[in-house]
Protein backbone atom coordinates (compact mmCIF):
# COMPACT_ATOMS: atom_id res chain seq x y z
CA UNK A 1 0.00 0.00 0.00
CA UNK A 2 1.20 3.53 -0.73
CA UNK A 3 0.40 6.93 0.73
CA UNK A 4 0.24 9.96 -1.56
CA UNK A 5 0.19 13.56 -0.30
CA UNK A 6 -0.73 16.50 -2.53
CA UNK A 7 -1.40 20.18 -1.83
CA UNK A 8 -4.52 21.48 -3.58
CA UNK A 9 -6.10 24.92 -4.00
CA UNK A 10 -9.49 25.92 -2.61
CA UNK A 11 -11.26 25.59 -5.97
CA UNK A 12 -9.86 22.11 -6.41
CA UNK A 13 -11.03 21.21 -2.92
CA UNK A 14 -14.64 22.04 -3.79
CA UNK A 15 -14.45 20.07 -7.03
CA UNK A 16 -12.94 17.11 -5.20
CA UNK A 17 -15.68 17.07 -2.57
CA UNK A 18 -18.38 17.23 -5.23
CA UNK A 19 -16.85 14.32 -7.15
CA UNK A 20 -16.36 12.11 -4.10
CA UNK A 21 -19.58 13.07 -2.31
CA UNK A 22 -21.23 9.66 -3.05
CA UNK A 23 -18.27 7.93 -1.38
CA UNK A 24 -18.08 10.15 1.70
CA UNK A 25 -17.36 8.45 5.04
CA UNK A 26 -17.67 9.76 8.57
CA UNK A 27 -14.59 10.75 10.58
CA UNK A 28 -13.97 12.44 13.93
CA UNK A 29 -10.79 14.38 13.22
CA UNK A 30 -11.56 18.14 13.22
CA UNK A 31 -8.41 18.74 11.15
CA UNK A 32 -10.05 16.78 8.31
CA UNK A 33 -12.58 18.74 6.26
CA UNK A 34 -13.73 15.80 4.12
CA UNK A 35 -13.16 12.04 3.99
CA UNK A 36 -14.12 9.45 1.39
CA UNK A 37 -13.43 5.83 0.49
CA UNK A 38 -13.08 5.55 -3.30
CA UNK A 39 -11.99 2.38 -5.13
CA UNK A 40 -10.39 0.98 -1.95
CA UNK A 41 -8.43 4.21 -1.42
CA UNK A 42 -8.98 6.36 1.67
CA UNK A 43 -9.10 10.06 0.74
CA UNK A 44 -8.58 12.60 3.53
CA UNK A 45 -8.79 16.32 2.75
CA UNK A 46 -7.30 18.38 5.58
CA UNK A 47 -8.39 21.95 6.30
CA UNK A 48 -4.84 23.04 5.51
CA UNK A 49 -5.43 22.02 1.89
CA UNK A 50 -3.40 18.84 2.13
CA UNK A 51 -4.94 15.77 0.49
CA UNK A 52 -3.82 12.34 1.68
CA UNK A 53 -4.60 9.28 -0.46
CA UNK A 54 -3.87 5.88 1.06
CA UNK A 55 -4.29 2.52 -0.62
CA UNK A 56 -2.80 0.22 -3.24
CA UNK A 57 -4.23 2.39 -6.05
CA UNK A 58 -3.33 5.75 -4.49
CA UNK A 59 -1.16 6.90 -7.42
CA UNK A 60 -3.80 5.84 -9.94
CA UNK A 61 -6.58 7.63 -8.08
CA UNK A 62 -4.45 10.77 -7.76
CA UNK A 63 -4.01 10.83 -11.54
CA UNK A 64 -7.70 10.08 -12.09
CA UNK A 65 -8.59 13.05 -9.89
CA UNK A 66 -6.18 15.23 -11.86
CA UNK A 67 -3.46 15.73 -9.27
CA UNK A 68 0.28 15.56 -9.69
CA UNK A 69 1.76 13.69 -6.75
CA UNK A 70 4.29 15.65 -4.73
CA UNK A 71 5.51 13.04 -2.29
CA UNK A 72 5.12 9.49 -1.10
CA UNK A 73 5.36 8.88 2.62
CA UNK A 74 7.42 5.75 2.06
CA UNK A 75 10.12 7.86 0.37
CA UNK A 76 10.36 10.81 2.74
CA UNK A 77 11.24 11.23 6.37
CA UNK A 78 8.17 12.46 8.14
CA UNK A 79 8.49 15.23 10.73
CA UNK A 80 6.74 15.14 14.08
CA UNK A 81 5.92 18.77 14.75
CA UNK A 82 2.21 17.99 15.03
CA UNK A 83 -0.04 15.85 17.26
CA UNK A 84 0.35 12.19 16.44
CA UNK A 85 -0.33 8.71 17.73
CA UNK A 86 2.54 6.26 17.79
CA UNK A 87 2.12 2.54 18.38
CA UNK A 88 4.64 -0.21 19.12
CA UNK A 89 4.76 -3.75 20.51
CA UNK A 90 7.18 -5.68 22.72
CA UNK A 91 7.39 -9.39 23.40
CA UNK A 92 6.72 -10.82 19.96
CA UNK A 93 10.29 -12.14 19.75
CA UNK A 94 10.40 -13.56 23.25
CA UNK A 95 9.43 -17.15 24.02
CA UNK A 96 8.48 -16.40 27.61
CA UNK A 97 6.12 -13.60 28.58
CA UNK A 98 3.16 -11.97 26.93
CA UNK A 99 2.75 -9.60 23.99
CA UNK A 100 2.43 -5.93 24.98
CA UNK A 101 1.10 -3.29 22.58
CA UNK A 102 0.82 0.40 23.42
CA UNK A 103 -0.50 3.40 21.48
CA UNK A 104 0.45 6.89 22.73
CA UNK A 105 -0.68 10.40 21.82
CA UNK A 106 2.09 13.00 21.81
CA UNK A 107 1.81 16.72 21.04
CA UNK A 108 4.69 19.05 20.10
CA UNK A 109 4.48 20.71 23.52
CA UNK A 110 5.37 17.34 25.08
CA UNK A 111 8.66 17.05 23.20
CA UNK A 112 10.90 18.99 25.61
CA UNK A 113 9.65 16.99 28.59
CA UNK A 114 10.19 13.71 26.79
CA UNK A 115 13.71 14.66 25.75
CA UNK A 116 14.53 15.70 29.33
CA UNK A 117 13.49 12.22 30.47
CA UNK A 118 15.81 10.68 27.91
CA UNK A 119 13.06 9.17 25.77
CA UNK A 120 14.66 7.48 22.79
CA UNK A 121 14.45 4.18 20.98
CA UNK A 122 13.67 1.89 23.92
CA UNK A 123 15.92 -0.79 22.45
CA UNK A 124 18.91 1.43 23.31
CA UNK A 125 17.78 1.93 26.93
CA UNK A 126 18.58 -0.42 29.79
CA UNK A 127 15.73 -2.23 31.49
CA UNK A 128 16.57 -0.29 34.66
CA UNK A 129 16.11 3.04 32.84
CA UNK A 130 12.87 1.85 31.27
CA UNK A 131 11.47 0.83 34.65
CA UNK A 132 12.32 4.31 35.94
CA UNK A 133 10.75 6.46 33.25
CA UNK A 134 7.79 4.32 32.13
CA UNK A 135 5.61 5.30 35.16
CA UNK A 136 6.33 8.99 34.45
CA UNK A 137 5.27 8.55 30.83
CA UNK A 138 2.13 6.68 31.83
CA UNK A 139 1.15 9.58 34.09
CA UNK A 140 1.92 12.35 31.60
CA UNK A 141 1.07 10.97 28.14
CA UNK A 142 -2.41 9.81 26.99
CA UNK A 143 -2.00 6.19 25.99
CA UNK A 144 -3.67 2.79 25.79
CA UNK A 145 -1.85 -0.35 26.90
CA UNK A 146 -2.82 -3.91 26.01
CA UNK A 147 -1.19 -7.09 27.30
CA UNK A 148 -1.95 -10.46 25.76
CA UNK A 149 -0.82 -12.97 28.38
CA UNK A 150 0.91 -16.17 27.23
CA UNK A 151 -2.07 -18.25 28.36
CA UNK A 152 -4.48 -16.16 26.28
CA UNK A 153 -1.97 -15.93 23.42
CA UNK A 154 -1.86 -19.72 23.15
CA UNK A 155 -5.65 -19.95 22.83
CA UNK A 156 -5.61 -17.47 19.92
CA UNK A 157 -2.35 -17.99 18.01
CA UNK A 158 -1.14 -21.11 16.26
CA UNK A 159 -1.98 -23.63 13.58
CA UNK A 160 -5.73 -23.92 13.10
CA UNK A 161 -6.48 -21.03 15.47
CA UNK A 162 -7.98 -17.58 14.92
CA UNK A 163 -4.69 -15.70 14.51
CA UNK A 164 -1.11 -16.14 13.38
CA UNK A 165 1.93 -14.26 14.71
CA UNK A 166 1.31 -11.30 12.36
CA UNK A 167 -2.48 -11.02 12.41
CA UNK A 168 -2.58 -11.00 16.22
CA UNK A 169 -0.30 -7.94 16.22
CA UNK A 170 -2.55 -6.22 13.68
CA UNK A 171 -5.52 -6.89 15.96
CA UNK A 172 -3.75 -5.54 19.04
CA UNK A 173 -2.37 -2.40 17.36
CA UNK A 174 -5.76 -1.66 15.84
CA UNK A 175 -7.54 -2.12 19.17
CA UNK A 176 -5.05 0.00 21.12
CA UNK A 177 -5.34 2.85 18.60
CA UNK A 178 -9.12 2.52 18.44
CA UNK A 179 -9.43 2.73 22.23
CA UNK A 180 -7.03 5.69 22.42
CA UNK A 181 -9.09 7.56 19.82
CA UNK A 182 -12.12 7.03 22.07
CA UNK A 183 -10.35 9.30 24.59
CA UNK A 184 -11.05 12.16 22.15
CA UNK A 185 -7.42 12.71 21.20
CA UNK A 186 -7.00 14.28 17.77
CA UNK A 187 -3.90 13.15 15.87
CA UNK A 188 -2.87 14.49 12.49
CA UNK A 189 -1.13 11.20 11.77
CA UNK A 190 -0.94 7.68 13.17
CA UNK A 191 2.43 5.93 13.00
CA UNK A 192 2.96 2.22 13.67
CA UNK A 193 6.40 0.68 13.99
CA UNK A 194 6.35 -1.55 10.90
CA UNK A 195 6.21 -5.31 11.46
CA UNK A 196 4.59 -6.17 8.11
CA UNK A 197 3.66 -4.47 4.83
CA UNK A 198 0.78 -1.99 4.52
CA UNK A 199 -1.10 -4.37 2.25
CA UNK A 200 -0.72 -7.29 4.64
CA UNK A 201 -1.77 -5.10 7.57
CA UNK A 202 -4.95 -4.05 5.75
CA UNK A 203 -5.67 -7.64 4.72
CA UNK A 204 -5.71 -8.80 8.33
CA UNK A 205 -7.52 -5.64 9.45
CA UNK A 206 -10.61 -6.57 7.44
CA UNK A 207 -11.63 -9.19 10.02
CA UNK A 208 -11.45 -6.80 12.98
CA UNK A 209 -14.68 -5.50 14.48
CA UNK A 210 -13.51 -2.08 15.64
CA UNK A 211 -12.47 0.21 12.79
CA UNK A 212 -11.50 3.87 12.47
CA UNK A 213 -11.19 6.11 9.42
CA UNK A 214 -7.93 7.87 10.27
CA UNK A 215 -5.11 6.82 7.95
CA UNK A 216 -2.22 4.84 9.40
CA UNK A 217 1.38 4.71 8.25
CA UNK A 218 3.77 1.83 8.97
CA UNK A 219 7.41 2.91 9.19
CA UNK A 220 10.44 0.74 9.92
CA UNK A 221 12.40 1.69 13.05
CA UNK A 222 9.77 4.32 13.81
CA UNK A 223 10.69 4.29 17.51
CA UNK A 224 13.97 6.04 16.62
CA UNK A 225 12.20 8.68 14.47
CA UNK A 226 9.04 9.57 16.39
CA UNK A 227 8.79 10.35 20.09
CA UNK A 228 5.22 9.03 20.21
CA UNK A 229 6.40 5.61 19.05
CA UNK A 230 9.37 5.73 21.45
CA UNK A 231 6.98 6.45 24.34
CA UNK A 232 4.84 3.46 23.34
CA UNK A 233 7.92 1.28 23.03
CA UNK A 234 9.09 2.18 26.54
CA UNK A 235 5.69 1.68 28.17
CA UNK A 236 5.22 -1.61 26.31
CA UNK A 237 8.69 -2.82 27.33
CA UNK A 238 7.93 -2.06 30.98
CA UNK A 239 4.60 -3.87 30.74
CA UNK A 240 6.33 -6.89 29.21
CA UNK A 241 9.02 -6.91 31.91
CA UNK A 242 6.42 -6.70 34.68
CA UNK A 243 4.59 -9.68 33.18
CA UNK A 244 7.84 -11.63 32.92
CA UNK A 245 8.65 -10.82 36.57
CA UNK A 246 5.21 -11.93 37.74
CA UNK A 247 5.42 -15.21 35.83
CA UNK A 248 8.92 -15.84 37.20
CA UNK A 249 7.73 -15.29 40.76
CA UNK A 250 4.71 -17.55 40.30
CA UNK A 251 6.71 -20.43 38.84
CA UNK A 252 9.85 -20.04 40.93
CA UNK A 253 12.13 -19.86 37.89
CA UNK A 254 13.82 -16.80 36.37
CA UNK A 255 12.25 -16.62 32.91
CA UNK A 256 14.60 -15.05 30.33
CA UNK A 257 13.62 -12.60 27.63
CA UNK A 258 14.31 -13.61 24.04
CA UNK A 259 14.18 -16.97 22.29
CA UNK A 260 17.72 -18.30 22.59
CA UNK A 261 19.25 -21.39 24.16
CA UNK A 262 18.70 -20.02 27.68
CA UNK A 263 14.95 -20.13 27.01
CA UNK A 264 15.27 -23.76 25.86
CA UNK A 265 17.04 -24.70 29.10
CA UNK A 266 14.56 -22.98 31.41
CA UNK A 267 11.63 -24.41 29.45
CA UNK A 268 13.03 -27.93 29.85
CA UNK A 269 13.32 -27.34 33.60
CA UNK A 270 9.70 -26.21 33.74
CA UNK A 271 8.65 -29.31 31.82
CA UNK A 272 10.39 -31.51 34.36
CA UNK A 273 8.93 -29.62 37.32
CA UNK A 274 5.36 -28.97 36.19
CA UNK A 275 4.77 -30.50 32.76
CA UNK A 276 3.46 -28.85 29.60
CA UNK A 277 0.88 -26.79 31.51
CA UNK A 278 3.71 -24.56 32.80
CA UNK A 279 4.77 -23.65 29.26
CA UNK A 280 1.17 -23.10 28.18
CA UNK A 281 0.90 -20.64 31.06
CA UNK A 282 4.19 -18.79 30.61
CA UNK A 283 5.40 -19.17 27.01
CA UNK A 284 4.35 -18.88 23.38
CA UNK A 285 3.89 -22.55 22.53
CA UNK A 286 4.17 -22.27 18.73
CA UNK A 287 7.80 -21.07 19.01
CA UNK A 288 10.46 -23.65 18.08
CA UNK A 289 11.75 -23.44 21.66
CA UNK A 290 8.96 -25.76 22.77
CA UNK A 291 10.20 -28.71 20.72
CA UNK A 292 13.81 -27.96 21.68
CA UNK A 293 12.83 -27.97 25.36
CA UNK A 294 10.99 -31.27 24.99
CA UNK A 295 14.08 -32.79 23.35
CA UNK A 296 16.31 -31.50 26.17
CA UNK A 297 13.97 -32.88 28.82
CA UNK A 298 13.98 -36.31 27.15
CA UNK A 299 17.78 -36.44 27.17
CA UNK A 300 17.74 -35.99 30.93
CA UNK A 301 15.38 -38.96 31.44
Curated annotation (Swiss-Prot):
GO terms for molecular function: magnesium ion binding; RNA binding; RNA-DNA hybrid ribonuclease activity. It is found in: Cytoplasm. Transmembrane segments: none annotated. PROSITE patterns: RNASE_H_2. GO terms for cellular component: cytoplasm; ribonuclease H2 complex. Its EC number is 3.1.26.4. Residues 82-299 form the RNase H type-2 domain. Keywords: Cytoplasm, Endonuclease, Hydrolase, Magnesium, Metal-binding, Nuclease. Its cofactor is Mn(2+); Mg(2+). It catalyses: Endonucleolytic cleavage to 5'-phosphomonoester. A divalent metal cation binds at residues 88-89, 193. Disulfide bonds: none annotated. It comes from the Bacteria. InterPro entries: RNase_HII/HIII, RNase_HII/HIII_dom, RNase_HIII, RNase_HIII_N, RNaseH-like_sf, RNaseH_sf, TBP_dom_sf. One of its GO terms (biological process) is DNA replication, removal of RNA primer. It is an enzyme of class 3 (hydrolase). Endonuclease that specifically degrades the RNA of RNA-DNA hybrids. Belongs to the RNase HII family. RnhC subfamily. This is Ribonuclease HIII. It comes from Streptococcus uberis (strain ATCC BAA-854 / 0140J). The gene is rnhC.
